[in-house]
Curated annotation (Swiss-Prot):
It comes from Vitis vinifera (Grape). GO terms for molecular function: structural constituent of ribosome. The lineage of its organism: Eukaryota, Viridiplantae, Streptophyta, Embryophyta, Tracheophyta. Pfam families: Ribosomal_S16. The keyword Nucleotide-binding does not apply. Gene3D superfamilies: 3.30.1320.10. Keywords: Chloroplast, Plastid, Ribonucleoprotein, Ribosomal protein. This is Small ribosomal subunit protein bS16c.
Amino acid sequence: MVKLRLKRCGRKQRAVYRIVAIDARSRREGRDLRKVGFYDPIKNQTYSNVPAILYFLEKGAQPTGTVHDISKKAEVFTELRLNQTKFKFNQ
């Protein structure tokens, strides 16, 4: 199973996180499948590669709680619903 979760980067006391698609059995710092975003909690900055996140969500990836909240703020799930309705109408 693939998960969308945070991977810690940065130095001591100055953590920044990458949002990555990674196998659920891998450790936090393990090899990721793809980097799909960035989150800096200190500066409160976020970058999300929305097409990549949508790709993994459509393939069945499960976001962790924090990644879910970050994606909700970036309105990724509204775009996912729009893509699903377009897909249903095309069939």
